[in-house]
Structures are given as C-alpha cells and as structure tokens.
C-alpha cells in the first residue's frame, strides 16, 4: 500500500491513489447519479447521500475502507475506536464553480475521492487562520480530521 503523509498545522493529511482506473460500470453509475442532483452553494451534490451502499460501488467502498483503517492505525492511533463509513455522496463541480468552505462536526475522519481532477486548476484548501492547499490528482484519496474546514476550488 503506497501513500504519503503531509503535515499541515501540523496535522497529517493522508493522500493515496486508488491504484486502478474506475470501471465502466462505476463511471456509468456516477453518470446516472449526476441526473439526480441538487444545487449546493456553488456546485451540485447528489440527492443520494449513501452512494457507497450501492452494489456497483462495493469494490470501491472496500478499497476506501482499507485506506481508512490505515489512516486510523498510522495517524490517529485510536486503540479502542473502529472507524466506519456513515455517509457518502458525489459532488459535481464544473469550471468556475467551487465547493464551499465547510467542516464535518459529526465525524472524526472525513475524506474526498477525486474522480476527475485537473491538477493544473483543482485544489483542496484547508483553513485554520491560515490555509494550506493540496493539488489532487485523479483517483487520489485525501483523508483529514473532520474538524478541519476545507473547500474545493479550481
């Protein structure tokens, strides 16, 4: 399993690649989900907030969970806490759109999987009085503590 740890504020951020292409079935399912979306502040979010429960994403969820356990083991080192996935959704952000700054106060770990990132323009920014930008690549996982405000910009 290949990944790197990037420390900001000095909080480590876990970045790893999916390590494979998205299957045609997964892409088709994402395209279908893109037809059931609603407006967010400046982009769109899927109506379904449990997409990883769909059978088509079973393999993806398993791969994600493997990295989630690794993050928990290496970064948090919580001995008596077993992480689990509560919600999962898709955000659709076009050129000149962004994903608003937010946090996930009801979670301990949050993550983003980039399905189609433009490394020249796309970035995730983390805020804590100052901010840190990370340029994602397509198929990157990015896990962070849920208390960190973050937004996606291009």
Per-region residue spans from a language model:
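A residue-level signal for beta-strand positions that form part of recognition/binding surfaces
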Residues: 13, 87, 123
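A short glycine-rich, His/Asp/Glu-containing loop-to-beta-strand
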Residues: 83-91
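Catalytic core of non-heme Fe(II) oxygenases with the double-stranded beta-helix
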Residues: 91-154
